[in-house]
C-alpha cells in the first residue's frame, strides 16, 4: 500500500480517526468499540424492552436504528457505527433470515442450484433503509464524529447461509464442506463478493466515512483455507471500493498478519493474539485497530481494565493506532467497565 495515500473526510469536530488514517499527529489515540451500541448499555436494553419487536423488525426501522446507533455518543467514543446486522444484504438476495431469537434461514444454501437462484440486489432499491439510516446519522451527527459502515465478509456470510443459522458450534465442519465442494464454494463466494462491493460502496455514497469488513470466524480457518477462499474475496472487495474512503479488515483472532495485510485494507483490526508493537513495526504502512481482550473488559475488575488498556496504548506508542477490543463487547460486560476503558484511554 502507498504510504502517501490520502483519504478524504468531511470537516469533523472530532477528527482523530481521520488524522490517524492520514498519518497526521493526534493528541490521543481514538477509541470506539465493536458492538458499542448493544446489550451492555442499560438504555439499549430499556428501549428494546419497551419496543418489543424482533431484531429483524428493529433493523428495518430507520428511526429506531438511528437512535440506537447514537447511544454510545454519551460514552465519549470517537466514532459512531451504524446499528445493523451483517446478514441484512442477504434478504434481497432471497436468503432472508428470521430471528427466533437467533437467525434462522428456512432453506439453507447447500447446492449449486440454490446459489444460482440467489439474486444480486440493487442497494439503492433493495437496501434503501440502510442508506436512510446512514443519511439520518450523518444529519444527526452534524459533523461531530466520523460515521462507520460495515459488512460481513463473504466466507462469514456463507457460513450462515450453509448452516441456515448461526454456524457455531459446527464452523469447522462447514469449512470442510466448503473445501470439499470447490465449485459450489467459488460460485457462492463470487456472488457474495459482488454483493458486498455494491453494499459497501452504497454505504459510502450514503455517508459512511470509514467501512469495516467483518470476517467473524477467521479464528476457525486454517491458513491454507484463508489464503484460498477468504483472502481473494477481501482483495477483490478492497480493490473495488471507493479509494477516497479508508477500509478496515477485521479477521477475528487470525494471526497471520502477512495474509491480512495483502488484502489491500488500509487498517487491520487485530485480536490480542497479535503483538501490537511488532505489528506496527513490521507493517508501518498500515493502521492497526484493537486489541484489548474483550474478556478482560467483561470480567476483569477496574484495575485489570486499566492495566490492559494502558498496556495496549504503550505497545502502539500512540502511532498508527485506533483503540478497540479483540472483538465485540460481550453481553455480560457492564457499562461501568466500558466507560472505565474509554476514560482510561482518554487519560493516556
What is each PLM-predicted segment?
Residues 126-348:
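Active-site loop segments of alpha/beta catalytic cores
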Residues 20-36, 77-104, 125-169:
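Glycine-rich, aromatic-flanked loop segments that form ligand/cofactor-binding clefts
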Residues 81-101, 105-123, 207-226, 326-328:
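Glycine-rich, proline-tolerant flexible connector loops at the mouths of alpha/beta enzymes
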Residues 22, 32-35, 41, 45-48, ...:
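Generic, ordered loop/turn and secondary-structure boundary motif
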